[in-house]
């Protein structure tokens, strides 16, 4: 019986040690997930290393193609032992989180 309990505890600990999925990221002791506000992310993670506009071309009412800002891509670098994270934000909300290469 004791052996089964040890195995169960070990299994739970191993599952808890698995990194968060690609639609979430850990900042210090906080977790950021898709749908969180950018204000919440700034409080938990601080300023990103880089902010880039995401644009796309759209046709306006006069038939002209214009470049429209669609959102932003924020880059977080948590150091050389961690993966960089690319966070897409739009209208003040996190809409996507992607893993990048190892940080510097």
Q: Where is each model-derived feature located?
A:
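Hydrophobic alpha-helical targeting segments used for export or membrane insertion
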Residues: 10-14
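Bacterial N-terminal signal peptides that target proteins for export
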Residues: 1-9
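N-terminal signal peptide c-region/cleavage motif recognized by signal peptidases
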Residues: 17-19
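Residues within mature, well-folded domains
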Residues: 22-104
């Amino acid at each position: 019986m004791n052996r089964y309990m040890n195995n169960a505890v070990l299994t739970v600990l191993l599952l808890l040690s698995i990194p968060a999925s690609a639609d979430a990221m850990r900042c210090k002791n906080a977790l950021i997930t898709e749908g969180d506000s950018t204000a919440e992310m700034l409080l938990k993670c601080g300023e990103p290393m880089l902010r880039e506009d995401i644009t796309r071309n759209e046709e306006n009412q006069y038939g002209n193609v214009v470049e429209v800002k669609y959102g932003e891509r924020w880059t977080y670098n948590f150091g050389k032992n961690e993966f960089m994270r690319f966070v897409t934000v739009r209208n003040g909300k996190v809409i996507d989180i992607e893993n990048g290469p190892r940080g510097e």
